[in-house]
Amino acid sequence: MQTLNFPTYEFRFKSNENKRYIFDIIRKKFVVLTPEEWVRQHAVRFLLQDRGYPQSLMNVEKRIQINHLTKRYDIVIYRPDGSIFLVVECKAPQVGLTQEVFDQIARYNLTL
């Protein structure tokens, strides 16, 4: 996988049926290792290890309703009272930060 602009972290991997998997410590399971998942797992580790957010207040791929459509946040950090504190949208390294990407986050923000 591509080197990212994050500190170096130790990850658990496995391979099965010509697919590579990475262990997600939040979901507590192996997930298919895609370029976006690679970014998401680095962001999770950064938030936990380098920024000190508690794992108990973090959720990955949280589903939400936006205008009667189900969408997913990549990473959500909650306040102790259960309200959303931080939303992280991850993109594969080769995905550009276009207006469409900014619009996606803006739509998520409207539901908060």
Task: Identify what each model region corresponds to.
Residues 1-112:
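A short, conserved, highly charged catalytic patch centered on acidic carboxylates
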